[in-house]
Amino acid sequence: MASEKPQDLMVTCTAPVNIAVIKYWGKRDEALILPINSSLSVTLHQDQLKTTTTVAISKDFTEDRIWLNGREEDVGQPRLQACLREIRRLARKRRSTEDGDTLPLSLSYKVHVASVNNFPTAAGLASSAAGYACLAYTLAQVYGVEGDLSEVARRGSGSACRSLYGGFVEWQMGEQADGKDSIARQIAPEWHWPQLRILILVVSADKKQTGSTVGMQTSVETSTLLKFRAESVVPERMKEMTRCIQEQDFQGFAQLTMKDSNQFHATCLDTFPPISYLNDTSRRIIQLVHRFNTHQGQTKVAYTFDAGPNAVIFTLEDTVAEFVAAVRHSFPPAANGDKFLKGLQVAPVLLSDELKAALAVEPSPGGVQYIIATQVGPGPQVLDDTHDHLLGQDGLPQRDL
Protein backbone atom coordinates (compact mmCIF):
# COMPACT_ATOMS: atom_id res chain seq x y z
CA MET A 1 0.00 0.00 0.00
CA ALA A 2 2.80 2.42 0.81
CA SER A 3 4.81 4.12 -1.91
CA GLU A 4 8.56 3.57 -2.37
CA LYS A 5 9.68 6.37 -0.06
CA PRO A 6 9.15 5.24 3.56
CA GLN A 7 8.17 8.72 4.72
CA ASP A 8 5.42 8.95 2.10
CA LEU A 9 2.18 7.02 2.03
CA MET A 10 -0.50 6.16 -0.51
CA VAL A 11 -3.77 4.37 0.24
CA THR A 12 -6.74 3.49 -1.99
CA CYS A 13 -10.22 2.65 -0.72
CA THR A 14 -13.76 2.26 -2.01
CA ALA A 15 -17.03 3.39 -0.45
CA PRO A 16 -20.69 2.73 -1.25
CA VAL A 17 -23.72 4.76 -2.23
CA ASN A 18 -26.55 4.82 0.29
CA ILE A 19 -30.24 5.44 -0.38
CA ALA A 20 -32.35 6.97 2.37
CA VAL A 21 -35.72 5.39 3.07
CA ILE A 22 -36.40 7.96 5.80
CA LYS A 23 -35.14 11.17 4.22
CA TYR A 24 -32.71 13.78 5.50
CA TRP A 25 -33.69 17.25 4.31
CA GLY A 26 -32.71 20.36 6.23
CA LYS A 27 -29.89 21.42 8.53
CA ARG A 28 -30.07 23.10 11.92
CA ASP A 29 -26.39 24.07 11.65
CA GLU A 30 -24.96 24.81 8.20
CA ALA A 31 -21.32 24.88 9.30
CA LEU A 32 -21.30 21.61 11.25
CA ILE A 33 -23.90 20.02 8.94
CA LEU A 34 -26.29 18.95 11.68
CA PRO A 35 -29.71 17.73 10.48
CA ILE A 36 -33.15 18.80 11.66
CA ASN A 37 -34.22 15.15 11.78
CA SER A 38 -32.75 11.66 11.95
CA SER A 39 -32.65 9.53 8.80
CA LEU A 40 -32.30 5.89 7.80
CA SER A 41 -30.69 4.40 4.72
CA VAL A 42 -29.81 1.24 2.85
CA THR A 43 -26.21 0.76 1.69
CA LEU A 44 -25.97 -0.42 -1.93
CA HIS A 45 -23.45 -3.02 -3.07
CA GLN A 46 -20.12 -1.75 -4.36
CA ASP A 47 -20.02 -4.37 -7.10
CA GLN A 48 -22.46 -2.06 -8.91
CA LEU A 49 -22.02 1.43 -7.39
CA LYS A 50 -18.97 2.83 -5.67
CA THR A 51 -16.50 5.64 -5.32
CA THR A 52 -12.79 4.79 -5.44
CA THR A 53 -10.38 7.23 -3.80
CA THR A 54 -6.59 7.34 -3.58
CA VAL A 55 -4.94 9.60 -1.01
CA ALA A 56 -1.20 10.26 -1.09
CA ILE A 57 0.94 12.38 1.21
CA SER A 58 4.54 13.35 0.61
CA LYS A 59 7.14 15.83 1.79
CA ASP A 60 7.65 16.59 -1.93
CA PHE A 61 4.11 17.91 -2.45
CA THR A 62 3.93 21.70 -2.41
CA GLU A 63 0.15 22.04 -2.05
CA ASP A 64 -3.02 20.05 -1.43
CA ARG A 65 -4.60 18.95 -4.74
CA ILE A 66 -7.69 16.95 -5.74
CA TRP A 67 -8.90 15.32 -8.96
CA LEU A 68 -12.52 14.17 -9.35
CA ASN A 69 -13.30 11.85 -12.26
CA GLY A 70 -10.09 12.93 -13.98
CA ARG A 71 -10.57 16.69 -13.62
CA GLU A 72 -8.63 18.79 -11.14
CA GLU A 73 -11.01 20.63 -8.83
CA ASP A 74 -10.66 23.53 -6.40
CA VAL A 75 -9.07 22.13 -3.25
CA GLY A 76 -10.17 25.27 -1.40
CA GLN A 77 -13.82 24.17 -1.54
CA PRO A 78 -15.06 24.80 2.04
CA ARG A 79 -16.49 21.33 2.71
CA LEU A 80 -13.38 19.61 1.42
CA GLN A 81 -11.25 21.84 3.64
CA ALA A 82 -13.51 21.04 6.61
CA CYS A 83 -12.88 17.30 6.07
CA LEU A 84 -9.13 17.78 5.82
CA ARG A 85 -9.04 19.98 8.92
CA GLU A 86 -11.11 17.53 10.94
CA ILE A 87 -9.05 14.44 10.03
CA ARG A 88 -5.79 16.28 10.70
CA ARG A 89 -7.16 17.45 14.06
CA LEU A 90 -8.02 13.86 15.00
CA ALA A 91 -4.59 12.68 13.84
CA ARG A 92 -2.85 15.32 15.98
CA LYS A 93 -5.04 14.34 18.93
CA ARG A 94 -4.13 10.68 18.44
CA ARG A 95 -0.43 11.47 18.20
CA SER A 96 -0.46 13.61 21.35
CA THR A 97 -2.08 10.83 23.39
CA GLU A 98 0.40 8.13 22.37
CA ASP A 99 3.84 7.40 23.75
CA GLY A 100 6.39 8.81 21.38
CA ASP A 101 5.98 9.63 17.73
CA THR A 102 4.71 6.35 16.32
CA LEU A 103 3.37 7.71 13.04
CA PRO A 104 5.93 7.39 10.21
CA LEU A 105 4.70 10.54 8.53
CA SER A 106 4.33 14.23 9.12
CA LEU A 107 1.03 16.01 9.53
CA SER A 108 2.59 18.96 7.76
CA TYR A 109 2.82 17.03 4.48
CA LYS A 110 0.49 18.13 1.71
CA VAL A 111 -2.10 15.69 0.40
CA HIS A 112 -3.07 14.65 -3.14
CA VAL A 113 -6.49 13.06 -3.68
CA ALA A 114 -7.91 11.33 -6.76
CA SER A 115 -11.47 10.05 -6.76
CA VAL A 116 -13.66 8.37 -9.38
CA ASN A 117 -17.31 7.32 -9.39
CA ASN A 118 -18.56 4.44 -11.53
CA PHE A 119 -21.99 6.11 -11.76
CA PRO A 120 -23.36 9.52 -12.85
CA THR A 121 -22.24 12.33 -10.56
CA ALA A 122 -24.75 14.91 -9.24
CA ALA A 123 -27.76 13.23 -10.85
CA GLY A 124 -29.54 12.22 -7.68
CA LEU A 125 -27.49 9.06 -7.13
CA ALA A 126 -25.94 10.21 -3.85
CA SER A 127 -22.50 10.73 -5.37
CA SER A 128 -21.43 13.26 -2.73
CA ALA A 129 -22.29 10.80 0.06
CA ALA A 130 -20.12 8.04 -1.41
CA GLY A 131 -17.40 10.54 -2.31
CA TYR A 132 -17.00 12.13 1.11
CA ALA A 133 -17.37 8.79 2.94
CA CYS A 134 -14.58 7.42 0.78
CA LEU A 135 -12.43 10.51 1.36
CA ALA A 136 -12.92 10.35 5.14
CA TYR A 137 -12.23 6.61 5.29
CA THR A 138 -9.12 6.82 3.09
CA LEU A 139 -7.71 9.82 4.97
CA ALA A 140 -8.25 7.90 8.21
CA GLN A 141 -6.16 5.00 6.86
CA VAL A 142 -3.37 7.39 5.85
CA TYR A 143 -3.29 9.28 9.14
CA GLY A 144 -3.90 6.28 11.40
CA VAL A 145 -7.17 7.66 12.76
CA GLU A 146 -9.40 5.03 14.35
CA GLY A 147 -12.95 5.04 15.66
CA ASP A 148 -16.12 6.65 14.35
CA LEU A 149 -15.61 8.89 11.33
CA SER A 150 -19.16 10.30 11.23
CA GLU A 151 -17.99 13.80 12.07
CA VAL A 152 -15.33 13.84 9.35
CA ALA A 153 -17.62 12.52 6.60
CA ARG A 154 -20.55 14.65 7.73
CA ARG A 155 -18.51 17.83 7.32
CA GLY A 156 -18.29 17.03 3.61
CA SER A 157 -21.84 15.85 3.00
CA GLY A 158 -24.37 15.08 5.70
CA SER A 159 -25.53 11.79 4.25
CA ALA A 160 -21.91 10.68 3.77
CA CYS A 161 -21.78 9.49 7.38
CA ARG A 162 -24.36 6.83 6.45
CA SER A 163 -22.01 5.45 3.75
CA LEU A 164 -19.42 4.59 6.41
CA TYR A 165 -21.35 1.41 7.20
CA GLY A 166 -22.85 -1.45 5.27
CA GLY A 167 -26.36 -2.82 5.57
CA PHE A 168 -29.02 -0.61 7.12
CA VAL A 169 -27.83 2.60 8.74
CA GLU A 170 -29.35 5.23 11.01
CA TRP A 171 -28.00 8.78 11.18
CA GLN A 172 -28.99 10.03 14.61
CA MET A 173 -29.65 13.77 14.46
CA GLY A 174 -28.27 14.26 17.97
CA GLU A 175 -29.04 17.05 20.39
CA GLN A 176 -25.69 18.63 21.27
CA ALA A 177 -24.82 21.98 19.72
CA ASP A 178 -21.30 20.77 18.84
CA GLY A 179 -22.69 17.78 16.93
CA LYS A 180 -20.68 15.17 18.85
CA ASP A 181 -23.79 12.98 19.15
CA SER A 182 -24.86 13.40 15.51
CA ILE A 183 -23.48 10.08 14.32
CA ALA A 184 -24.26 7.15 12.07
CA ARG A 185 -24.75 3.63 13.38
CA GLN A 186 -25.59 0.33 11.73
CA ILE A 187 -28.97 -1.11 12.73
CA ALA A 188 -28.62 -4.32 10.69
CA PRO A 189 -25.69 -5.80 8.71
CA GLU A 190 -25.65 -6.28 4.94
CA TRP A 191 -26.47 -10.00 5.19
CA HIS A 192 -29.55 -9.40 7.37
CA TRP A 193 -32.14 -9.39 4.52
CA PRO A 194 -30.64 -11.44 1.67
CA GLN A 195 -33.81 -11.44 -0.46
CA LEU A 196 -33.94 -7.63 -0.73
CA ARG A 197 -33.10 -6.22 -4.15
CA ILE A 198 -32.68 -2.67 -5.40
CA LEU A 199 -33.26 -1.38 -8.93
CA ILE A 200 -32.07 2.07 -9.93
CA LEU A 201 -34.08 3.43 -12.84
CA VAL A 202 -31.85 6.06 -14.43
CA VAL A 203 -34.17 8.63 -15.95
CA SER A 204 -31.57 11.34 -16.42
CA ALA A 205 -27.83 11.49 -15.88
CA ASP A 206 -27.89 15.28 -16.20
CA LYS A 207 -26.85 17.52 -13.32
CA LYS A 208 -29.87 18.66 -11.33
CA GLN A 209 -30.99 22.29 -11.57
CA THR A 210 -31.29 22.91 -7.81
CA GLY A 211 -28.49 21.38 -5.72
CA SER A 212 -29.32 19.71 -2.42
CA THR A 213 -27.45 22.26 -0.29
CA VAL A 214 -29.31 25.27 -1.69
CA GLY A 215 -32.59 23.36 -1.90
CA MET A 216 -32.72 22.22 1.71
CA GLN A 217 -31.60 25.62 3.02
CA THR A 218 -34.52 27.26 1.21
CA SER A 219 -36.88 24.58 2.52
CA VAL A 220 -35.79 25.17 6.12
CA GLU A 221 -36.37 28.90 5.70
CA THR A 222 -39.78 28.73 4.00
CA SER A 223 -41.56 25.36 4.44
CA THR A 224 -43.87 24.95 7.43
CA LEU A 225 -44.53 21.39 6.27
CA LEU A 226 -40.83 20.56 6.65
CA LYS A 227 -40.84 21.78 10.26
CA PHE A 228 -43.92 19.66 11.01
CA ARG A 229 -42.33 16.65 9.30
CA ALA A 230 -39.09 16.91 11.28
CA GLU A 231 -40.74 17.39 14.65
CA SER A 232 -43.96 15.36 14.43
CA VAL A 233 -43.59 12.72 11.70
CA VAL A 234 -40.02 11.47 11.39
CA PRO A 235 -39.38 10.33 15.00
CA GLU A 236 -42.19 7.76 14.85
CA ARG A 237 -41.28 6.74 11.30
CA MET A 238 -37.69 6.03 12.40
CA LYS A 239 -38.97 3.58 15.00
CA GLU A 240 -41.40 1.95 12.59
CA MET A 241 -38.85 1.63 9.78
CA THR A 242 -36.30 0.10 12.17
CA ARG A 243 -38.91 -2.46 13.22
CA CYS A 244 -39.81 -3.29 9.60
CA ILE A 245 -36.15 -3.88 8.75
CA GLN A 246 -35.40 -5.97 11.83
CA GLU A 247 -38.51 -8.12 11.24
CA GLN A 248 -38.05 -8.22 7.45
CA ASP A 249 -41.57 -6.86 7.07
CA PHE A 250 -41.49 -5.93 3.39
CA GLN A 251 -45.07 -4.67 3.23
CA GLY A 252 -44.45 -2.20 6.04
CA PHE A 253 -40.98 -1.29 4.78
CA ALA A 254 -42.22 -0.68 1.23
CA GLN A 255 -45.25 1.41 2.13
CA LEU A 256 -43.33 3.58 4.59
CA THR A 257 -40.52 4.06 2.07
CA MET A 258 -42.97 5.38 -0.53
CA LYS A 259 -44.85 7.57 1.94
CA ASP A 260 -41.63 9.15 3.17
CA SER A 261 -40.40 9.80 -0.37
CA ASN A 262 -43.73 11.42 -1.22
CA GLN A 263 -43.63 13.61 1.88
CA PHE A 264 -40.06 14.70 1.17
CA HIS A 265 -41.07 15.85 -2.31
CA ALA A 266 -44.17 17.50 -0.85
CA THR A 267 -41.89 19.61 1.38
CA CYS A 268 -39.96 20.57 -1.76
CA LEU A 269 -43.20 21.80 -3.34
CA ASP A 270 -44.08 23.56 -0.07
CA THR A 271 -40.77 25.42 -0.31
CA PHE A 272 -40.98 28.95 -1.72
CA PRO A 273 -40.13 29.27 -4.54
CA PRO A 274 -41.08 25.60 -5.00
CA ILE A 275 -38.52 22.95 -5.93
CA SER A 276 -39.40 20.05 -8.20
CA TYR A 277 -36.87 17.26 -8.54
CA LEU A 278 -39.27 14.82 -10.22
CA ASN A 279 -40.09 14.95 -13.92
CA ASP A 280 -42.87 13.39 -16.02
CA THR A 281 -41.03 10.07 -16.26
CA SER A 282 -40.58 10.00 -12.47
CA ARG A 283 -44.32 10.43 -12.04
CA ARG A 284 -45.03 7.70 -14.61
CA ILE A 285 -42.81 5.35 -12.59
CA ILE A 286 -44.78 6.16 -9.43
CA GLN A 287 -48.00 5.35 -11.29
CA LEU A 288 -46.48 2.14 -12.65
CA VAL A 289 -45.48 0.94 -9.17
CA HIS A 290 -48.93 1.54 -7.69
CA ARG A 291 -50.71 -0.18 -10.60
CA PHE A 292 -48.29 -3.12 -10.39
CA ASN A 293 -48.96 -3.50 -6.66
CA THR A 294 -52.73 -3.18 -7.10
CA HIS A 295 -52.67 -5.97 -9.68
CA GLN A 296 -50.62 -8.17 -7.33
CA GLY A 297 -53.05 -7.56 -4.49
CA GLN A 298 -50.23 -6.56 -2.15
CA THR A 299 -47.26 -4.20 -1.99
CA LYS A 300 -44.48 -6.04 -3.82
CA VAL A 301 -42.52 -3.02 -5.09
CA ALA A 302 -41.61 0.35 -3.54
CA TYR A 303 -40.15 3.53 -5.01
CA THR A 304 -38.11 6.28 -3.45
CA PHE A 305 -36.65 9.42 -5.04
CA ASP A 306 -33.85 11.57 -3.67
CA ALA A 307 -33.13 15.08 -4.94
CA GLY A 308 -33.34 14.06 -8.59
CA PRO A 309 -35.61 12.30 -11.11
CA ASN A 310 -34.05 8.82 -10.89
CA ALA A 311 -36.16 6.19 -9.14
CA VAL A 312 -34.78 3.69 -6.66
CA ILE A 313 -36.97 0.61 -6.48
CA PHE A 314 -37.01 -1.85 -3.57
CA THR A 315 -38.44 -5.31 -4.09
CA LEU A 316 -37.75 -8.93 -3.18
CA GLU A 317 -35.78 -11.38 -5.27
CA ASP A 318 -38.85 -13.27 -6.51
CA THR A 319 -40.44 -10.10 -7.94
CA VAL A 320 -37.43 -8.52 -9.69
CA ALA A 321 -37.82 -10.20 -13.09
CA GLU A 322 -41.52 -9.42 -13.46
CA PHE A 323 -41.08 -5.78 -12.45
CA VAL A 324 -38.11 -5.30 -14.81
CA ALA A 325 -40.34 -6.68 -17.58
CA ALA A 326 -43.04 -4.18 -16.56
CA VAL A 327 -40.51 -1.34 -16.83
CA ARG A 328 -39.39 -2.57 -20.27
CA HIS A 329 -43.02 -2.69 -21.37
CA SER A 330 -43.76 0.82 -20.09
CA PHE A 331 -40.44 2.41 -21.12
CA PRO A 332 -39.19 0.47 -24.16
CA PRO A 333 -35.41 0.91 -24.57
CA ALA A 334 -34.79 3.47 -27.31
CA ALA A 335 -31.59 1.72 -28.42
CA ASN A 336 -28.94 -0.70 -27.16
CA GLY A 337 -31.55 -2.91 -25.56
CA ASP A 338 -28.81 -5.30 -24.44
CA LYS A 339 -27.33 -2.51 -22.29
CA PHE A 340 -30.66 -1.52 -20.75
CA LEU A 341 -30.07 -3.72 -17.68
CA LYS A 342 -26.77 -3.43 -15.81
CA GLY A 343 -25.52 -5.02 -12.61
CA LEU A 344 -27.00 -8.22 -11.22
CA GLN A 345 -28.38 -10.61 -13.81
CA VAL A 346 -32.16 -10.73 -14.14
CA ALA A 347 -33.80 -13.52 -16.13
CA PRO A 348 -36.18 -12.25 -18.85
CA VAL A 349 -39.86 -13.08 -18.34
CA LEU A 350 -42.99 -12.44 -20.36
CA LEU A 351 -45.70 -10.25 -18.87
CA SER A 352 -49.18 -11.71 -18.68
CA ASP A 353 -51.89 -9.99 -20.71
CA GLU A 354 -53.70 -9.33 -17.43
CA LEU A 355 -50.75 -7.40 -16.01
CA LYS A 356 -50.26 -5.46 -19.25
CA ALA A 357 -53.91 -4.45 -19.10
CA ALA A 358 -53.62 -3.51 -15.43
CA LEU A 359 -50.61 -1.28 -16.11
CA ALA A 360 -52.64 0.54 -18.77
CA VAL A 361 -49.74 2.75 -19.76
CA GLU A 362 -48.96 4.53 -22.98
CA PRO A 363 -45.39 3.32 -23.71
CA SER A 364 -42.77 6.03 -23.30
CA PRO A 365 -39.75 4.91 -25.37
CA GLY A 366 -36.42 5.94 -23.88
CA GLY A 367 -38.01 7.40 -20.75
CA VAL A 368 -35.79 5.17 -18.63
CA GLN A 369 -32.24 5.20 -19.99
CA TYR A 370 -31.14 2.06 -18.16
CA ILE A 371 -31.62 0.02 -14.98
CA ILE A 372 -28.93 -0.90 -12.44
CA ALA A 373 -29.82 -4.05 -10.49
CA THR A 374 -28.08 -4.36 -7.13
CA GLN A 375 -28.49 -5.51 -3.54
CA VAL A 376 -27.58 -4.47 0.00
CA GLY A 377 -23.82 -4.23 0.46
CA PRO A 378 -20.92 -3.64 2.87
CA GLY A 379 -19.24 -0.44 4.01
CA PRO A 380 -15.90 1.03 2.84
CA GLN A 381 -13.05 -1.29 1.83
CA VAL A 382 -9.26 -0.88 1.63
CA LEU A 383 -7.74 -2.02 -1.69
CA ASP A 384 -4.37 -3.67 -1.03
CA ASP A 385 -3.28 -4.05 -4.66
CA THR A 386 -1.04 -1.12 -5.65
CA HIS A 387 -2.35 -1.46 -9.22
CA ASP A 388 -5.61 -0.01 -7.93
CA HIS A 389 -3.97 3.33 -7.06
CA LEU A 390 -5.36 6.25 -9.06
CA LEU A 391 -2.19 8.27 -8.45
CA GLY A 392 1.31 7.45 -9.64
CA GLN A 393 4.54 7.67 -7.62
CA ASP A 394 4.72 11.34 -8.62
CA GLY A 395 1.38 11.98 -6.93
CA LEU A 396 -0.39 12.75 -10.21
CA PRO A 397 -3.23 10.81 -11.88
CA GLN A 398 -1.54 7.85 -13.56
CA ARG A 399 -4.22 6.85 -16.03
CA ASP A 400 -7.24 8.15 -17.85
CA LEU A 401 -9.82 8.34 -15.09
Swiss-Prot record:
GO terms for cellular component: cytosol. Keywords: Acetylation, ATP-binding, Cholesterol biosynthesis, Cholesterol metabolism, Cytoplasm, Lipid biosynthesis, Lipid metabolism, Lyase, Nucleotide-binding, Steroid biosynthesis, Steroid metabolism, Sterol biosynthesis, Sterol metabolism. It comes from the Eukaryota. It is found in: Cytoplasm. Its EC number is 4.1.1.33. The modification N-acetylalanine is found at residue 2. (R)-5-diphosphomevalonate binds at residues 24-27, 79, 157-162, 213. It catalyses: (R)-5-diphosphomevalonate + ATP = isopentenyl diphosphate + ADP + phosphate + CO2. The keyword Lyase applies. It holds the Pfam family MDD_C. One of its GO terms (molecular function) is diphosphomevalonate decarboxylase activity. Pathway: Steroid biosynthesis; cholesterol biosynthesis. The keyword ATP-binding applies. One of its GO terms (biological process) is positive regulation of cell population proliferation. Belongs to the diphosphomevalonate decarboxylase family. Homodimer. Catalyzes the ATP dependent decarboxylation of (R)-5-diphosphomevalonate to form isopentenyl diphosphate (IPP). Functions in the mevalonate (MVA) pathway leading to isopentenyl diphosphate (IPP), a key precursor for the biosynthesis of isoprenoids and sterol synthesis. This is Diphosphomevalonate decarboxylase.
